[in-house]
Amino acid sequence: MAVLTDEQVDAALPDLNGWERADGALRRSVKFSAFLDGIDAVRRVAEHAEAKDHHPDIDIRWRTVTFALVTHSEGGITDKDVQMARDIDGILG
C-alpha cells in the first residue's frame, strides 16, 4: 500500500471531522463530558480496530482522547488510515 502525499492527505481532510495532519500522522482529539465516556469510546474504537486489524495510537488524558493514525509498516499515512479516520468518525458520531 502506497504512502499518500501531503497533497493527497490534505485533500482528504475536509471530509474528516476534526482530523489534522501532524507529526506524520492523522490526529484527532475529542473531549468527552466524563472520563468514563472517553474510555467507552476507546473501547468501541478498539473493537473496530481489532476487527479491521488496523490499530490507532490512543492517548487518554482525563476527558480528552487523542487518536493518531499512521501505517507504521509503510512509514506514513495510507488510504487505510484515511478510512479508519472515517470509521472512527462514525463510531464517535
Swiss-Prot record:
* SUPFAM superfamilies in UniProt: PCD-like
Keywords from UniProt, A to Z, are: Lyase
EC number(s) from the headed UniProt entry: 4.2.1.96
Q: InterPro entries under this entry? A: PCD_sf, Pterin_deHydtase
What family classification does the UniProt entry report for this protein? Belongs to the pterin-4-alpha-carbinolamine dehydratase family.
The record's listing under PANTHER family reads: PTERIN-4-ALPHA-CARBINOLAMINE DEHYDRATASE (PTHR12599:SF0)
This one is known as: Putative pterin-4-alpha-carbinolamine dehydratase
The organism is Mycolicibacterium vanbaalenii (strain DSM 7251 / JCM 13017 / BCRC 16820 / KCTC 9966 / NRRL B-24157 / PYR-1) (Mycobacterium vanbaalenii)
